[in-house]
Amino acid sequence: MQAWVIGNWKQNPATSHDVNALLDDLCAAISTTKQMSHDNSARCQIMVAPSLIHLAAVNGRLKDTSILCAAQDVSGHSASVGAYTGECSAQQIVDAGATWTILGHSERRQYHQESNDALLQKMIHALSQDLGVVFCIGESQEQYDTKQTLTVIDNQLVVIKEFITQQPELIDALPTRLIIAYEPVWAIGTGKVPTVAEVSATHKHIKQTLAGFADSLSNMTVLYGGSVNADNANSFAADPMIDGALVGGASLKADSFLTIATAFSQASI
């Protein structure tokens, strides 16, 4: 299975100049990294998710590379146009050059109170425009401490089950247009990291749950996110249940981001 390493830039960098500098560093690092050469890039797909205001410019810079571009969110109100101040639709995001969008990140769930119903609508709109979805799930520190991880994840995965029920005509697209990113909330940006064994067991549960929804979902891509860095990437990449990484802070430094991608590329050999 092809690995994926996705850089979620969040509300960074601050200026267009900084964005271009990061892209310069990233492209230069890729060109000099043997394991991430064009011949080997098929083993690990790299994607970055810039701020919306930089999306079109980043896509323009990356159009002649193998790096894909994603949005960090999409409107749940409409797939195309409408009187929704401050929103950006899936159609508009595709027009800006993105081929994927992140949905359900814990920061969106926390700061914008995004519910399963809201995320279902966003998923429907995204996939109706052939905008792939990186769907984030994960438990809080309290839920982890009280051993509720799998229960929480099952509740979050209900969005996928409901999508299949409501949009059966789109189910065939899911194996190639849906990626799950398991990000324990307590590990995001904290430096706290679950063991590889814990992540592997959780990923196995996620894969089995998805396979139970539909036969076509028996081999889904599941990434890990949460304080992934250059130092721990090899240990995660070595586990066959972990298909890649959703990277936050470490994606803002080209060298660290490429070290993570290289780890998964080598593990896919």
UniProtKB/Swiss-Prot annotation:
Enzyme class: isomerase
One Pfam family it belongs to: TIM
Pathway note: Carbohydrate biosynthesis; gluconeogenesis; Carbohydrate degradation; glycolysis; D-glyceraldehyde 3-phosphate from glycerone phosphate: step 1/1
GO biological process, any: gluconeogenesis
CDD domains: TIM
Active site: 105, 183
Record GO cellular component, one term: cytosol
Reactions catalysed, as given in the entry: D-glyceraldehyde 3-phosphate = dihydroxyacetone phosphate
Keywords: Cytoplasm, Gluconeogenesis, Glycolysis, Isomerase
Residues at which substrate binds: 8-10, 189, 227, 248-249
SUPFAM superfamilies: Triosephosphate isomerase (TIM)
GO molecular function, one term: triose-phosphate isomerase activity
NCBIfam families: tim (TIGR00419)
Family to which the UniProt record says this protein belongs: Belongs to the triosephosphate isomerase family.
UniProt subunit comment: Homodimer.
Protein name: Triosephosphate isomerase
The species this protein was found in: Moraxella sp
